[in-house]
Amino acid sequence: MGNRGMEELIPLVNKLQDAFSSIGQSCHLDLPQIAVVGGQSAGKSSVLENFVGRDFLPRGSGIVTRRPLILQLIFSKTEYAEFLHCKSKKFTDFDEVRQEIEAETDRVTGTNKGISPVPINLRVYSPHVLNLTLIDLPGITKVPVGDQPPDIEYQIKDMILQFISRESSLILAVTPANMDLANSDALKLAKEVDPQGLRTIGVITKLDLMDEGTDARDVLENKLLPLRRGYIGVVNRSQKDIEGRKDIRAALAAERKFFLSHPAYRHMADRMGTPHLQKTLNQQLTNHIRESLPTLRSKLQSQLLSLEKEVEEYKNFRPDDPTRKTKALLQMVQQFGVDFEKRIEGSGDQVDTLELSGGARINRIFHERFPFELVKMEFDEKDLRREISYAIKNIHGVRTGLFTPDLAFEAIVKKQVVKLKEPCLKCVDLVIQELISTVRQCTSKLSSYPRLREETERIVTTYIREREGRTKDQILLLIDIEQSYINTNHEDFIGFANAQQRSTQLNKKRAIPNQGEILVIRRGWLTINNISLMKGGSKEYWFVLTAESLSWYKDEEEKEKKYMLPLDNLKIRDVEKGFMSNKHVFAIFNTEQRNVYKDLRQIELACDSQEDVDSWKASFLRAGVYPEKDQAENEDGAQENTFSMDPQLERQVETIRNLVDSYVAIINKSIRDLMPKTIMHLMINNTKAFIHHELLAYLYSSADQSSLMEESAEQAQRRDDMLRMYHALKEALNIIGDISTSTVSTPVPPPVDDTWLQNTSSHSPTPQRRPVSSVHPPGRPPAVRGPTPGPPLIPMPVGATSSFSAPPIPSRPGPQNVFANNDPFSAPPQIPSRPARIPPGIPPGVPSRRAPAAPSRPTIIRPAEPSLLD
């Protein structure tokens, strides 16, 4: 016969477990451990066995449980047991389980009453149990026997405390009825770890072995030595019953008959016995499950909310709906167009704070990278002067010219304009790369439909490539237009007269320092990369770039200036990235081979990314610091020709040089303005319009709709998993709601005055016998409950001593007298209120037993009373 209450809980817990396992999680109910604590031969193992409903633990007289037994009950469809020390063997006969426990105990402790703290781990799989842990502990003893060590008492207590200290442990404090309750070590230990008494249940065993005429009624009614959760009396099988193979069913029937027939217990028979103990423990398990439900519910609700948004699109999913694929295709294409436009035009909705979007990158190309590429093709001064001198001489031919020729200016300008084609085409290529990258990022949302994604990328990329050709043609046309007519009447053009005076004005301007406010072009952190380790190694500084100088400071407060470097004769060159470095480096050097900083001919400045390097280079260009040119030509001849010019030719070269500078600046300004406009119109805006208006038609013509909208296996699995998870979460929440409504929590009993457990050191000499207490407790309960119970009770016992004090004493005079003095204020231990509660059926022979006990009372108790009162 199993534990019916526990079997009723099994479906409830299984529902929860199934609900959680369906969402791929485990339901951690963490049901309480049930630990049985008590003295030797108190009946601990029998109590535990009755709770499980199986006969499998060793029992007998003396110390039988000599190692802790950790019994794990695990719900399973088949019934068997296995030990941790021999996992490979499954026990289906529980007699063999008992024999294995005895054998394993002897293997570690020997056969001569030895004790070991090493636990035996037993797992019992059964369809009739919950997932619980039960602990059978060795009995508390004070005197070592056999192979037991001298400190056996402390060893056992430490062992017990390890198991019952856990907050979720229920403690069954087992005390036999024929022993002293006030000195119960089990209750004392429980009080240490559970001072509020919330998880301690008193269990009184061996009620059938009490002396005739004595009972434990007041203890079981929680009037004498009360506990918060009270006491439950049980009657276990005797050793004779066990040897006679009396099963648990018959034992429970005999127990019930005992309580119904006993005059002291029949009125509370429904609150006594193993079934009531099972019911009480099962109610504690129910309470624990209910207490766990709010945490589980909030956990499930948070998961459900996180899934709501993702599941919203799947809720109305109908695989057999003929319009489903059409709707999905339209929705996907529209979403792709919206995402593409947001990434290009920018949007305040869901801004990416980790990296630049496509539109921001294209903006950087237009206004940082492209101007930098234009300045990079800046002509070399010596080469330009040589070309101008050759042009002037070739135009004059054999004649000696008196005036500066216009044709030389036009020839040089046209040659410079042609050089603009390369940076302009490179700008288009950079924009195309960003557009294609943006398309791929936007199609990532189409990953559910691989064929649709592939076709969308192909069609849009093909269109961008088509627009690339037209855009490049248009840009080349712009350059050809600039080359076709040199407009020397432009309002920004300096003209011949101004060109001749420009050199003088520039020299004067350089001689007079700028008294106005210096314009700061850029600020930021840079690392000087080539300072030797001997001088501190590479270090990060705060750099400030103006139109005249480059300064660096210790930090961004700009209070402690480290150095200021004038920009005259400075240029930029690229530096290869170090093998072990993740920094991107460029260098600044002096064209006149002078040191730029201390003993360094160049300073290497490091940034975290190539984009930062390009941005700094563009800033240096604005300040007039240009990139280094490759000197592929023979400079010796150039120098000879340059320096061999006569003064008149030199003046003409200088004039044309200034005119070329002025006109090329006008063209650069125009190209810098027209390039972004041309690319935006011919490429970006056209691509957006194509996606919005024509992409869908191209998709329909490129492939069958069914093949386009075939889901990937991963996406179908993901959708199914998400929907299953969503419904499982809702089902689990419904189950939790059902459990909450179908079960009832038992309220915690109110606190009781259990100071007797704390004062047992002073009471311990007196109370020796609980059975007797049940005979004369009516006068004693007030003594325990009230703060000053003694005085009012003194007169009552005096009158009652002769007539009602004897019945409990005859069987064990000594212990009875000691127990009678549990109340230090009552000189005579018996209270006269008992007669009214004694059933009329008390045997007439009881009075004859009273006389022997009376003489022993003064001898044992009276000498101890004064010290107790003190």
UniProtKB/Swiss-Prot annotation:
The modification Phosphoserine is found at S764. Changing Y597F: Strongly reduced phosphorylation. Decreases receptor-mediated endocytosis. It holds the Pfam family Dynamin_N. It comes from Rattus norvegicus. It is found in: Cytoplasm, Cytoskeleton; Cytoplasmic vesicle, Clathrin-coated vesicle; Cell projection, Uropodium; Endosome. Residues 847-864 have a biased composition (Low complexity). GDP binds at S41, G43, K44, S45, S46, R59, G60, K206, D208, D211, N236, R237, Q239. Phosphorylation at Ser-848 by GSK3-alpha relieves the inhibition of BIN1 and promotes endocytosis. Phosphorylation at Ser-764 by CDK1 is greatly increased upon mitotic entry. It regulates cytokinesis downstream of calcineurin, and does not affect clathrin-mediated endocytosis. Dephosphorylated by calcineurin/PP2 during cytokinesis in a Ca(2+)- and calmodulin-dependent manner. Phosphorylated on tyrosine residues by EGFR. Phosphorylated on tyrosine residues after activation of SRC. The modification N6-acetyllysine is found at K299, K598. It comes from the Eukaryota. InterPro entries: Dynamin, Dynamin_GTPase, Dynamin_GTPase_CS, Dynamin_N, Dynamin_stalk, G_DYNAMIN_dom, GED, GED_dom. CDD domains: DLP_1, PH_dynamin. Residues 205-208 are annotated as: G4 motif. Residues 653-744 form the GED domain. Changing S764E: Abolishes midbody localization and shows increased multinucleation. One of its GO terms (cellular component) is photoreceptor inner segment. Ubiquitously expressed. Brain expression is restricted to glial cells and fibroblasts. Highest levels in the testis. Residues 741-870 are annotated as: Disordered. The modification Phosphotyrosine is found at Y231, Y597. Residues 28-294 form the Dynamin-type G domain. Oligomerizes into a helical polymer that self-assembles around the vesicle membrane, when associated to the menbrane through lipid binding. Interacts with SHANK1 and SHANK2. Interacts with SNX9. Interacts (via C-terminal proline-rich domain (PRD)) with SNX18 (via SH3 domain); this interaction regulates ATG9A and ATG16L1 trafficking from recycling endosomes to sites of autophagosome formation. Interacts with SNX33 (via SH3 domain). Interacts with PSTPIP1 (via SH3 domain). Interacts with CTNND2. This is Dynamin-2. SMART domains: DYNc (SM00053), GED (SM00302), PH (SM00233).
